[in-house]
Amino acid sequence: MVFDSEYDLGYPVYGAQFLSDGMLLVAGGGGVGVMIPNKLTALRVNFEKKKVLKRYREITLDSQDDSPSNLGVAQNMILMGCNEGYDKISSTGENHHIRKFVFENDHLKFIGAIDFDGSTDPEVYTKLICMSKDGTIAAIASSKLPTVIRIIDPIDLTEKYEIETGRDVRDIHFSPDGKLLVYITATSLEVVSVVTGRFLFRKTDFNKATDLARVKFINDDDFVLASGFKDKAGIALTTFRIRNTNPTILSSKKVFKDYKKITAMDVDPKGQLIALTTDDNSLALLSVKKLNVIKLFKQVHKDTITRVTVSPGGQYVATGSTDKTVHIFKISPDAMGGSNLWKSLLRFLFNVMKLAVVVIWAHLFYKYDLHHKLYDVTKVQLEKRSIEFPSFLDGILGTTTTRSTIIEGDIVSVVTDTAPALTSSVFSEDNKEYAKVEETTPSNSWSSVSESYWPSEVSNDIESVQENFDDIENKILENEDVVMKNDAIETEDESVGFDIDDTIKPIAPIDIDLELDDPLASTSVDTSEVLSSQVPVQLETLSGQSEIIDDKPEHLDEEVSEGFLGDHSKANLETEIENASTSISIEESTNSHSTFIESSSSLEEGRNTTSESSREISSETSIIKEDMLYPTENVSEQSATDKVNKNQSIDKIDVSSSSSIPTSSEGSSNSIVGDEAQMHISSLSSIETELSSSSIMINEESTIRNADSVVDENHSESKLPTEAKTSIVGSIDNENIDSTELNNLEEAVKTSSNESSLSQVTEELVKNNERVSNQSLSTVSTEHTEMKESSNLTEKKPESNSPESNLSESSLQTHDFSQISDTERNIVSSSAFVTDLPSEEASVNPGNTEGTIVNASLVDSQSSNSSVKTVETNVSQDEQTSQNETLSVGAATIDVIQGSYTSVSDSLDGMNNEEVGNKVHIEDVSNTLEIDSSASALSEQGDNQFSDSTPEVVNVINEFTTTPENETSSPLASSSTTFMTESPSPIAVANEVIENIQQDEQVAQQMEDTNSGSSNFQDTQHNVINDEL
């Protein structure tokens, strides 16, 4: 759409150019001596108002001056060509034909005038004026021939240089960047570099019939040339491109045939539109790209059109004419681009077609379920690709890559994990020890191993892990060796707490049920108690080589085991005493129950026993005496396993965190079994009967980790050992010795030199036994409380490593006789002696290579199911009574021999001649040592030795110390104690025993003097080794 408006200025227009899109500048006049004024006018253009063109600013020139002939405008600077009047030129001799104006603050201002030609001819005027777009340079040319083009500075109105053309120049124009200047003559075209002033391009080979009329730059490289024909009508347009001084013709076209001459031409700053006027006063709008006519306005003016100009925005085109009018046209973008209606219609139709195609495809997909089929195909292809083309990062990172494709709905995600996969290295040789501890004690430390397992790897390796734990569980149940023989064990404590009920993620270790194979029946133990859920344990790391450790830590606190006796009523206690004759066999199982391990300290600390320990010994002695005076009924022959299943039960154990465990591969925790009160009484009873038959010294000290077992009244909690000494139990059954042989033996003793003294001692012993039996029930009830209180005392290791200290550990352990009667001393003094054992056989826990002081109990043949029990008493004596007690022990030994023979004779009257095997059982986690001496062999030896005379009793001891044929090494065979086998007299035996006791007492006295400042005490510790009969 094109809108036009006409405005009558009142003077002929010779120059016109836009200052801006809304401001049009025109100039003209009547000339010298004419009543028509010469003016410079600024017109405001606004098609929104009724009056589109309005005279906005105007300057009237001197009436004596000539009319303006041309205008050049850029950046609000105005150069106008206008000659002065004839009179003024004649009088001054100068013609200031170039005048400068500026448009500032919406006002036109005159700046000055200059004469570049130096001509005084009033007929010579300024024909051409052109300014660069940026207003930095301008070019002017006069009507004088040949034409000289002057390059001037429009700011200070100075001339830079001149271009001699030698011809009549018809038109000039600057490129948009102001670097090139093109001008044409009637037959030639030339391009000049404004910077250097040199000619870049010249074209003179045009057709002779061509008449060049106008030239304008489209952009910095292209320009358009308008030409006519000399002898015929027609107008042609040609576009050129200048590249590297070699111009090329882009296009050329004859646009009009009827018009002969072009009067004016201009190109919009955007390079899209060409506006030209013809000799018939018409305006044509043409496309620069196609050189076709967009719009033709015929007969716009009544007279010749002198100027045509396009606004900077390209939306207005203005024409000026000598008819004193100005026409202005508003051109829409549709007009400049041709008919846009068809283009819009075509664009609309194309969009409709695209939409129709999309709708058709969507309908087909829905009808034939193609979207689901496409989804399935894509899923399969992605899965194949994930398998066939693994991640390229595998080779770069060098890691095990696990890829998984997850397709949920419309989302497809690929997860790549580069964590190392779970391998068997978790259970490698370096981690065997750790794994073995974890088998039985699944602590939270397992979480640290499990946290490194990725879920995808765990799912692949869960089966192998479960097989590993199955093997571990089988090893635990089969009680296989973990720490091999002669292996060294160095301990490093590490506290670990765990919950058995905890679930360890992502792999939970297989729970190991603590099932009891042979529960021991007890009237005072509640077998329904469950295993405590919280089991804090002290773990120890095993390493090193096995050897005897002579030095002991200087500051090592040990917890003392609490007593075995609980609170029992008198009726229950009587029942327990009756059942004391029945031997108790305790089968050790790694999963279900544990062994009592005796804990013994050094002899120096053993001597410092409090009065409470003495009272406990008195109570134990009373029980022993009562058991001797009132032996239990005979028990029918049956196997040890049947008796255990029938009569005993065991509590489940809760291990306290305050004790340290001797760690085996299965991680077995020791437990306290049975009714401690009943076992304690029956143990004391059997020891008294056995000691009255013979005294055996087992002098082997094999130190292991101390096992302090603490049992509360409900038997539900136990503390595992910290520094334990293992008891090795030996027993001899003299079951086939009849009463006749014992009577002969008694008569032989009575005929000795001390016959009268022995008879008196025997009578006194019988009386004391009757008295003690009445007190046994009352003393037993208080024993447990006293022993509990005394167990809180902590025991310290002797700081001295002198030979005396080492000797004291292997010397005889004695009771404190300061608070018991002479007869009681006689009985107690006949306790087991000490002998040395090889450490490899005596070691229950290879982690400890110290010697262990043990007792050997002789089991009476009446107690066919009696258990091998050990009661070790480390008792110290005061300095004030030590020497007197030594003499009492020596004198009492003779009394024991006579009294024990009498008691054994009485107790064997109603006994069945049962054959009971005696075993000395040393059970290690790594190996099991059994010393099994046949009861029948002992019976035959006993018949031969006791049938002749009394002195042969010594041979029974020698037979016991002889190594059985089926054993490679016996702990008794290495005894360092000398037994008198040649003397037929029991007096000589007694004297030898007294001498040994005195020597031990002297050594103990020396140690006591050295460590007289010690004030720590320790109670008697009672532990029982779980041996199998």
Swiss-Prot record:
Q: Where is the composition biased (Low complexity)?
A: 579-592, 655-672, 800-812, 858-867
Query: Which terms does the UniProt entry file under GO BP?
Result: endoplasmic reticulum to Golgi vesicle-mediated transport; protein transport; regulation of COPII vesicle coating
Tell me, what is one Gene Ontology molecular-function annotation carried by this entry? GTPase activator activity
Q: Please, which domain of life does this record's source organism belong to?
A: Eukaryota
Stretches in topological domain Lumenal:
366-1029
Q: Methyltransferase: is it a keyword of this entry?
A: no
Where does it reside?
Endoplasmic reticulum membrane; Golgi apparatus membrane
Q: How does it sit in the membrane?
A: Single-pass type II membrane protein
The residues that cross the membrane are 345-365
Stretches of Basic and acidic residues bias are at 613-628, 643-654, 712-722, 783-799
GO CC list: endoplasmic reticulum membrane; Golgi membrane
Swiss-Prot/TrEMBL WD repeat ranges = 257-296, 300-339
List the glycosylation sites.
Answer: N579, N608, N634, N647, N714, N754, N774, N792, N806, N855, N865, N874, N884, N966
Q: Which PROSITE patterns match?
A: WD_REPEATS_2, WD_REPEATS_REGION
What are the boundaries of the region Disordered? 579-673, 710-732, 747-821, 858-886, 963-982, 1003-1029
Q: Where is this motif: Prevents secretion from ER?
A: 1026-1029
Spans within the Cytoplasmic topological domain: 1-344
Show the ranges annotated as biased composition (Polar residues): 593-603, 633-642, 750-762, 771-782, 868-886
Q: Does the keyword Membrane apply?
A: yes
Name the keywords, alphabetized: Endoplasmic reticulum, ER-Golgi transport, Glycoprotein, Golgi apparatus, GTPase activation, Membrane, Protein transport, Repeat, Signal-anchor, Transmembrane, Transmembrane helix, Transport, WD repeat
Q: Which family does it belong to?
A: Belongs to the WD repeat SEC12 family.
Task performed by this protein:
Putative guanine nucleotide-exchange factor (GEF) involved in the formation or budding of transport vesicles from the ER. Positive regulator of SAR1 probably through inhibition of the GTPase activation by SEC23.
What protein name is recorded for this chain?
Answer: Putative guanine nucleotide-exchange factor SED4
Q: Which organism is it from?
A: Candida glabrata (strain ATCC 2001 / BCRC 20586 / JCM 3761 / NBRC 0622 / NRRL Y-65 / CBS 138)
**Lineage of source species:** Eukaryota, Fungi, Dikarya, Ascomycota, Saccharomycotina
